[in-house]
């Protein structure tokens, strides 16, 4: 789909124009696309974008890579729309040429998947080995969220453990015990093995 879109856009672009891919492209594809688009006289930026729903509202974290000549043009735009840390610094900077932006995003996703697995295992141990109920586990995750473990994933786990359905029962007990994936974790583990 990305390659088809590039083919549709190239005839509409002038030399030196910048094409930006903000999807979860696999970094080898971004390397290939950068070379191809540059061979046509245009510039290509492959940008990892992170932040989900909150990022859409408050600004995402952005990880641009690709054609170095494009960075100075997109930098003020990207750094204006991205999330900011407490001191106002932008959550966006140039990460490197070719597929570097999508590579960093892939590693970011891999770390996030690892964190989610650790949370699942902690939950299972507390529930099945220690016999803790949802309220007790909520308290543990709330305490963890006040330490160096503070994170969005710990926060939402804490919150879901406290949430009750309309009948007063914990909603977590009604959630189907399955998980899906979009394939990005498979790419991460495959590239890590290589």
State where each predicted segment sits.
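Short acidic alpha-helix initiation/capping motifs at coil-to-helix transition points
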Residues: 114-117, 180-187
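Class I S-adenosylmethionine-dependent transferase superfamily signal
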Residues: 9
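Rossmann-fold dinucleotide-binding core
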Residues: 2-6, 20, 26-138, 146-173
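Conserved short loop/turn motifs at secondary-structure junctions
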Residues: 143, 175-179
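Conserved small/polar residues in nucleotide/adenosyl-binding loops
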Residues: 188-193
């Amino acid at each position: 789909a990305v390659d088809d879109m590039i083919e549709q856009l190239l005839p509409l672009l002038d030399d030196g124009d910048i094409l930006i891919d903000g999807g979860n492209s696999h970094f080898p594809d971004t390397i290939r696309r950068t070379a191809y688009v540059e061979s046509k006289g245009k510039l290509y930026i492959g940008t990892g974008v992170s932040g989900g729903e909150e990022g859409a509202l408050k600004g995402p974290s952005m990880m641009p890579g690709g054609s170095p000549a494009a960075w100075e043009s997109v930098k003020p735009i990207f750094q204006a729309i991205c999330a900011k840390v407490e001191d106002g610094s932008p959550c966006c900077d140039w990460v490197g040429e070719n597929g570097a932006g999508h590579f960093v995003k892939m590693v970011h996703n891999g770390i996030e998947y690892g964190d989610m697995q650790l949370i699942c295992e902690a939950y299972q141990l507390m529930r099945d080995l220690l016999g803790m109920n949802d309220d007790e586990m909520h308290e543990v995750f709330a305490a963890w969220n006040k330490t160096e473990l503070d994170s969005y994933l710990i926060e939402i786990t804490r919150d879901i453990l406290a949430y009750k359905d309309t009948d007063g029962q914990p909603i977590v007990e009604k959630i189907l015990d399955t998980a899906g994936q979009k394939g990005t974790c498979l790419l991460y583990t495959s590239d890590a093995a290589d």
